[in-house]
Amino acid sequence: ESEFYIQVVKQGQTVACHDYSLRELLHDFGDLESCETYEYYNHNVNHGQGGQRRVTAKGWSLLTLLELLPEIPQREELENGSVKFQIFTNDNYKEKIVLEANELSAYRFLLAYEQDQRSQDGLEKGDTSSWADEDLHFAPIKGTTPFRVYCGKESANPSVYKNAAGMVVTILF
């Protein structure tokens, strides 16, 4: 059963669609798992006043997952503007955003399945640790999918895609 897909499009045609469950990703790519920390402004924290949120997420670099696929060109082609991508969510949020593949490495896009979440102004819904806590307390991602995609765009949205369901990669040549 697919919980996250990567669809590859070339010259307007789908040339491949790779479907993954969380179990498959853990089994097949567990050795490629990484941990990233992201800090970003969230307008919902601090009783709607806004504030800083820090997330340390476990998962897989989207760039690394792409580089494993036979349809994906070499990294230099990924980074020269010849490839674009979109991240899709189950709630259709942010789907119109099309990015260039070089942003995958520049902003550390991570397909996360567990996270330690904390808010600077006190515990908020979903937080697993206090801001000052030295230890990380990971919890599974909860939502309509077991994934979120985080990226290191601290000063520009989006920093997080909730309920991540898949991505479409378009090869322009």
Report each predicted region and the residues it spans.
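N-terminal intrinsically disordered, low-complexity segments enriched in P/E/S/T
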Residues: 1-173
